[in-house]
């Protein structure tokens, strides 16, 4: 019941009428929530490897419809080309939210009797889109491990939204190789953090910094000591 209420509040917030639509499911606000919907679904759907059957049939059907509408717009097959491993769509954390959520939504849909045989707007199957993004993120881990980790380095904004997406893929992917690689990337990120800080205060370079009010005491006291992992 609460999940249905949550969906209706999303629709109302986006000024929709009636049911979920492509425009609402792919909206900026819903994108920020999609990792939670993915986690709920993968943990509790009827065939979950974690806690199967805790989602009732109506809630599961509702979430699958939301996933379908989301990927119908947000999964761009060409973007999953391995040439784009270091491309950034908007910003790093938005990039990760945008496409990793598509991967896990596609994983759900390819295993759903109702959606597994459907074609996305480009004419490709759900499984083809899933395979493309799954391959992309496995290579993402290798490339980031070889050439650098996060682009938004010690940013006050990016990592707190990027890392939960990596954790979702580490926890929820059905691909054992992807889970293992995401786990290793998380270890590398925290190892990098550990060697760059002393007693919780980090030094070194940063990226994506907004010095909108350098005289603000809150900004001054946060400098070097407020890594976003504490607020994840």
Which functions belong to the PLM regions below?
Residues 174-232:
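Extended polysaccharide-engagement surfaces of secreted carbohydrate-active enzymes
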Residues 1-173:
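Aromatic-lined, polymer-binding surfaces characteristic
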């Amino acid at each position: 019941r609460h999940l249905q209420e949550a969906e209706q509040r999303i629709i109302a917030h986006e000024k929709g009428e009636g049911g979920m639509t492509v425009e609402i499911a792919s909206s900026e606000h819903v994108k920020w929530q999609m990792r939670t919907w993915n986690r709920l679904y993968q943990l509790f759907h009827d065939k979950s490897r974690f806690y199967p059957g805790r989602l009732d049939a109506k809630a599961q059907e509702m979430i699958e419809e939301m996933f379908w509408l989301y990927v119908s717009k947000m999964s761009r097959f060409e973007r999953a080309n391995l040439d784009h491993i270091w491309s950034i769509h908007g910003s790093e954390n938005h990039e990760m939210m945008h496409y990793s959520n598509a991967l896990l939504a596609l994983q759900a849909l390819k295993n759903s009797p109702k959606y597994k045989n459907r074609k996305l707007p480009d004419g490709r199957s759900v499984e083809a889109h899933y395979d493309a993004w799954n391959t992309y993120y496995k290579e993402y881990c290798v490339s980031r491990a070889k050439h650098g980790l996060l682009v938004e380095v010690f940013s006050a904004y990016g990592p707190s939204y990027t890392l939960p997406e990596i954790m979702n893929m580490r926890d929820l992917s059905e691909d054992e190789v992807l889970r293992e690689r995401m786990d290793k990337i998380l270890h590398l990120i925290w190892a990098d953090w550990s060697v760059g800080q002393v007693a919780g205060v980090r030094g070194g370079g940063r990226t994506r910094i907004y010095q909108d009010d350098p005289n603000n005491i809150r900004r001054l006291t946060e400098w070097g000591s407020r890594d976003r992992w504490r607020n994840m």
